[in-house]
Amino acid sequence: MLMLTSQTIDGKRISRYHGIVTGDALIGANIYKDIFSGVRDVVGGRTSAYERELARARELALSSMASAAERLGADAIIGVRLDYHNLGGTMGNTILVSTTGTAVSTEDEE
């Protein structure tokens, strides 16, 4: 599934707009869990364990959105947007990764 942040696709003409598609993924960022499990891998002020979890959540959200577009018969998603929301929590933070875009069908330009 082709996914782009732009509204156009070079070499393609949009033949049909299927509508808005979304995908979401939640991850728990629990500092206590990291400390006690020994996963604290801080390099240059960054925590790679969190970065890996964010990357995994982003891929899950994008995959969910792509599946929704495929169910509509689309072959591409334009105007893709990714948002990150801190939902808080009692033992750490819960992060929501949310993706939105417009599912479209395309044809080669003549």
Swiss-Prot record:
Family statement drawn from the similarity comment of this UniProt entry: Belongs to the UPF0145 family.
Protein name: UPF0145 protein MTH_507
Species per Swiss-Prot/TrEMBL record: Methanothermobacter thermautotrophicus (strain ATCC 29096 / DSM 1053 / JCM 10044 / NBRC 100330 / Delta H) (Methanobacterium thermoautotrophicum)
SUPFAM superfamilies attached to this UniProt entry: YbjQ-like
InterPro entries named among the record's database cross-references: UPF0145_dom_sf, UPF0145_YbjQ-like
Disulphides: none
Signal sequence segment: none
Pfam families xrefs: YbjQ_1
